[in-house]
Amino acid sequence: MKEIKAIIRPFKLLDVTEALQKIKGLPGVTVSEIKGFGKSRAKNAKDKVTYELVEFIPRIKLEVVVADEMADEVVNIIQRYSHTGNTGDGKIFVINVEEVVKIRTNERGKEAV
């Protein structure tokens, strides 16, 4: 199984989620509103940046756990529908998942997703 985490622009959320909902068997997606900054922001920072001076940019984090064979399709859809070509489009992380346990039923593995 794979956990896919994506950091995207907020205005791309609807496009991405509409496309993801068309994937047969997609177990679901968790969406969080987050803030942060990337390399380009950090490169422009002065040597000493106080916490108050850092501008955090609003972003959306998508998280989904899928079977290995579904991971490429999910990644490709997120990349395709969140891409603008501009700095700050975001990142997609793919992480191996050793185990999943569904709390309500104690199911494990793929069945728990």
Predicted regions and their residues:
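Positively charged, small/polar-rich N-terminal and surface patches that mediate targeting and assembly
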Residues: 1-113
